[in-house]
């Protein structure tokens, strides 16, 4: 029984580490759009550019004892900026990954300067 518990803990730890690896926005966004469109019907798939922008932004790590609010405010600054400035550059028919990615990067720069 103890061995089974240890195996489950090790596998869970490996899965958590795999999930924590960050995929660059430029790679995540087009794949997310394809998956979102395939899993949605009109008019729901019209939200895919926003959904994928939110999903592909680098989210902060889970809170720890040493974390502070700056990490979260930086993420929400990027999300707000990307939603306002970048989502409209993309559609299901024309993902415009290069422009959206550059726009999201500029949001990262703007938000980093503010914090």
From Swiss-Prot:
GO terms for biological process: defense response. Keywords: Disulfide bond, Plant defense, Secreted, Signal. Residues 1-20 form the signal peptide. InterPro entries: THNL. Is disulfide-linked. Its main location: secreted. One of its GO terms (cellular component) is extracellular region. Disulfide bonds: none annotated. It is found in: Secreted. Belongs to the plant thionin (TC 1.C.44) family. May be involved in plant defense. This is Thionin-like protein 2. The lineage of its organism: Eukaryota, Viridiplantae, Streptophyta, Embryophyta, Tracheophyta.
